[in-house]
Amino acid sequence: MNQNKPLPPWANIIPKDAFISYSPTYKVGEYFDRFHKESFKPADFADLTYYFYDPSEHGFPKDKTYPLITFLHGASNALEGDVCINYAGGEFYAKDQYQKALGGAYLLIPLANEYRDEEGRVKGGWGETPVNVLYELIDSFIKRKMGGRISKNILIGNSSGAWMTFNMGNNYAWFFDALIPVGAGEIPDDKMLDLYDKENVSLFYAIGKHDELNDFETLVVPRLERLKAMKNCFIYTPEWVQNGDKGIASINFGFEMGQHCLVNPMHCNLMFDDGTPMEPRLPNGVTGWIASL
């Protein structure tokens, strides 16, 4: 035990000079007031709640064409209310620093209709949300909120949201410019990756080598060479997922998943608190990669 926290199962294999960090170093909720909350009625599905950020309300010109970044949360996160903005990895994209790096961007955070059944199990997640329903929401948002104008269409997903990100790309490759799945072991087959290349879809594939929910050696390693062969695929597979304090990340909500929650450092633009990049190939972080598309 350490800091009254369970010792992670991987604690005995971390470097000798490393330390375990039991929580992210950032404050949750600081930018929630920059988001609006609305609901969308699909043609043949229950209403979906979503949050959004409009850059033209925060100093950017109204007549400019902007990218849209949509964030798909992980399992059970929709049950957390406004906190899902943060858990999905979208909150800090409303920060002035991030928006400046992107030249302004609309942000969209849809919520799956999650609930707990009588046994306490989470139901209604992305696995029970048809891809056409999510497409309908995003397409409608572009038309209603962005005047039908968009420079880039980017989809980011965490955990089960990363699975849904791939699922959306597999069905609507022509609709997206970039996919950023974080913590997904279900890498599409060669035929689908060929389609991504044909449709000029850029891929940022991110997963930790000690992800507790996805066996890296079994699920990821056999697909790495194929990912490297894509036209535009950035692969980020850190040996250890770290928090802003440079400690190795541990999160335990009944089971250890700190190494699965790569979304937290991704949310921090892959920057440590002292301003140094977590990934030397990305001196300007994730926002720099997005801005370069």
Where are these regions (language model features)?
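Short, solvent-exposed loop/turn and secondary-structure capping segments
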Residues: 62-64, 79-85, 119-123, 167-168, ...
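Short, proline-enriched alpha-helix->beta-strand connector loops that line the catalytic pocket
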Residues: 103, 197-203
